[in-house]
């Protein structure tokens, strides 16, 4: 019998619990308390050590002064008993030891002068002087020249009482200081984090109500700059939502018209095919089918344009080296297939730039389609690309159509905008909007002029300024050490001179620049 064994899976780990964290206000307040507490403790230790050393040093000085006074007075040699008894009226204990003869003592009530090893060493002449603390007394022992030894001690109880009071004072003052630091830290933190609270409230308000009102900015500190950045984000979000709403509204309006017409035609075709229904003439059937196909193509074009716009807005763009000459050639092939009655006069300089190949191809194709659409049968469309300087080239697409009225030029490249004369022509109203978006995204500029100023018809010319670098002639090898990728990356300089910096950037009533939010109504 064959047994099947299933591999045992390792036991699943329980998910880690989110550890509760303190709020920023509490963390700042605790940090302030900790810093103040550390400083208070260090200062308390320093004060305690300094005062303690000073008090004990003062006791040593007092004992030293008493011993020197007794020795200098000569009373220890003349009448040692009386001299020692005289110290009983002070606050010290005294003892005079004469080895082999006598010991004189005078002690305070309830106190006994302790004699230990250091004092015995002084008495035996092994040490000249000793100081030490024994119990609650400070002892000084001095060996005199006549062989006697003087021992003096003083009680440390008054000093210890002072030190105990000092400890309590430092403890109370330190505690009060930490408490004051906590309160002050809380107040400062609350005032300092008020802009953060406003930002939090604004973010929650946006999430709840989609209210994108800016937040008031106070001061010029880091939090004020953070608030300004947040307001900038709110403005960008508001503009994005406005563009999105406008795009949806315009797209719905533009889609409704061909869909309604398509639905009507399809219903008419279906009704004519029902049993017993009168048959439409063959010519009308052909026209209806042609209308349906044209409307489907119009819908496909509109959807494709919308996809291109949303693709750019979503940032789904891959940048790579792009040969603009090749882009223009491929676009011309497509336009020639649709308008084989148009003559294209082409003069293109080899040029390479780093960007979105699909977007650039769509922009060039839209310009050529636009020029071909407005050119009369047998007309000429000019396509030239000439180098202006080592890092810029100008692409010019010109036609000899009816031209654009000056009052409509500022509407060029607006989404879904179509002039009165253009509404009868095929198109979605998005082609030039895509051109504008692609050109600006690649650091370029665009302007519109009459092909023949004052002519009848004046025609229209689009001037597109693009960054990049020239390509070597065909058959010319790339210099050693420089790859094609290096050449392409050198063409990414986004710095583009203003229209007046080029020889063809004339400022006149017939020139509309993209930078001035112009638009072409076609």
Curated annotation (Swiss-Prot):
Span of domain HAMP: 190-242
Domain Histidine kinase: start-end pairs: 250-470
CDD domains: HAMP, HATPase, HisKA
Extracellular side: 52-167
Compartments, record wording: Cell membrane
Biased composition range(s): Polar residues: 502-522
Membrane topology reported for the UniProt record: Multi-pass membrane protein
Stretches for region Disordered: 467-522
InterPro entries the record matches: 2C_sensor_his_kinase, HAMP_dom, HATPase_C_sf, His_kinase_dom, HisK_dim/P_dom, HisK_dim/P_sf, Sig_transdc_His_kin-like_C
Chief location category: membrane
Keywords recorded for this protein, A-Z: ATP-binding, Cell membrane, Hydrolase, Kinase, Magnesium, Manganese, Membrane, Nucleotide-binding, Phosphoprotein, Protein phosphatase, Stress response, Transferase, Transmembrane, Transmembrane helix, Two-component regulatory system, Virulence
Recorded catalytic activity of this chain's protein: ATP + protein L-histidine = ADP + protein N-phospho-L-histidine
Superkingdom, taxonomy of origin: Bacteria
Record SMART domains: HAMP, HATPase_c, HisKA
Pfam families xrefs: HAMP (PF00672), HATPase_c (PF02518), HisKA (PF00512)
Record note on modification: Autophosphorylated.
Topology, Cytoplasmic side: 1-30, 189-522
EC number: 2.7.13.3, 3.1.3.-
Keyword Translocase on entry: no
GO cellular component terms given for this protein: plasma membrane
Residues that bear Phosphohistidine: 253
GO molecular function: ATP binding; phosphoprotein phosphatase activity; phosphorelay sensor kinase activity
Role according to the record: Member of the two-component regulatory system MprB/MprA which contributes to maintaining a balance among several systems involved in stress resistance and is required for establishment and maintenance of persistent infection in the host. In response to environmental signals MprB acts both as a membrane-associated protein kinase that undergoes autophosphorylation and subsequently transfers the phosphate to MprA, and a protein phosphatase that dephosphorylates phospho-MprA.
Protein name: Signal transduction histidine-protein kinase/phosphatase MprB
Organism: Mycolicibacterium paratuberculosis (strain ATCC BAA-968 / K-10) (Mycobacterium paratuberculosis)
């Amino acid at each position: 019998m064959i047994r099947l064994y299933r591999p045992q899976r390792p036991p699943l780990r329980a998910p880690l619990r989110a550890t509760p964290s303190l709020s920023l206000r509490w963390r700042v307040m605790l940090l302030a308390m900790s810093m103040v507490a550390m400083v208070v403790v260090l200062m308390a230790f320093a004060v305690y050590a300094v005062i303690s050393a000073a008090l004990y040093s003062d006791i040593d000085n007092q004992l030293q002064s008493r011993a020197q006074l007794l020795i200098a007075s000569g009373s220890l040699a003349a009448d040692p008993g009386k001299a020692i008894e005289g110290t009983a009226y002070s606050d010290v204990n005294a003892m005079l030891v004469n080895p082999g003869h006598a010991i004189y003592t005078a002690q305070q009530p309830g106190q006994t002068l302790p004699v230990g090893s250091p004092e015995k060493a002084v008495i035996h002449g092994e040490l000249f002087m000793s100081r030490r603390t024994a119990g609650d007394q400070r002892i000084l022992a001095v060996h005199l020249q006549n062989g006697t030894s003087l021992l003096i001690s003083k009680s440390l109880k008054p000093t210890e009482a002072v030190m105990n009071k000092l400890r309590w004072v430092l403890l109370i003052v330190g505690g009060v200081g930490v408490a004051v630091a906590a309160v002050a830290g809380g107040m400062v933190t609350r005032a300092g984090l008020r802009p953060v609270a406003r930002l939090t409230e604004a973010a929650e308000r946006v999430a709840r109500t989609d209210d994108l009102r800016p937040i008031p900015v106070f001061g010029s500190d880091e939090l004020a700059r953070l608030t300004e950045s947040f307001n900038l984000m709110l403005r960008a979000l508001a503009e994005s939502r406005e563009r999105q709403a406008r795009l949806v509204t315009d797209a719905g309006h533009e889609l409704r018209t061909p869909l309604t017409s398509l639905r009507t035609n399809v219903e008419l075709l279906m009704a004519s095919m029902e049993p017993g229904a009168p048959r439409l003439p063959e010519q009308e059937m052909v026209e209806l089918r042609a209308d349906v196909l044209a409307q489907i193509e119009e819908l496909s074009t509109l959807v494709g344009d919308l996809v291109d716009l949303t693709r750019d807005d979503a940032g789904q763009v891959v940048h790579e080296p792009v040969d603009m000459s090749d882009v223009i050639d491929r676009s011309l092939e497509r336009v020639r297939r649709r308008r084989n009655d148009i003559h294209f006069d082409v003069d293109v300089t080899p040029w390479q730039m780093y960007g979105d190949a699909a977007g650039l191809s769509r922009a060039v194709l839209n310009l050529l389609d636009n020029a071909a659409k407005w050119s009369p049968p047998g007309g000429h469309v000019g396509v030239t690309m000439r180098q202006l300087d080592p890092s810029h080239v100008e692409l010019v697409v010109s036609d000899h159509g009816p031209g654009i009225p000056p009052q409509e030029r500022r509407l060029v490249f607006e989404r879904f905008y179509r002039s009165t004369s253009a509404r009868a022509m095929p198109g979605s109203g998005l082609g030039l909007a895509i051109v504008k978006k692609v050109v600006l995204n690649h650091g370029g500029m665009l302007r519109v002029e009459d092909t023949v100023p004052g002519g009848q018809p004046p025609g229209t010319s689009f001037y597109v300024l693009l960054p990049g670098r020239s390509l070597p002639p065909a058959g010319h090898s790339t210099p050693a050490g420089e790859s094609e990728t290096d050449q392409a990356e050198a063409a990414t300089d986004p710095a583009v001179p203003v229209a007046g910096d080029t020889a063809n950037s004339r400022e006149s009533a017939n020139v509309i620049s993209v930078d001035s939010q112009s638009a072409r109504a076609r």
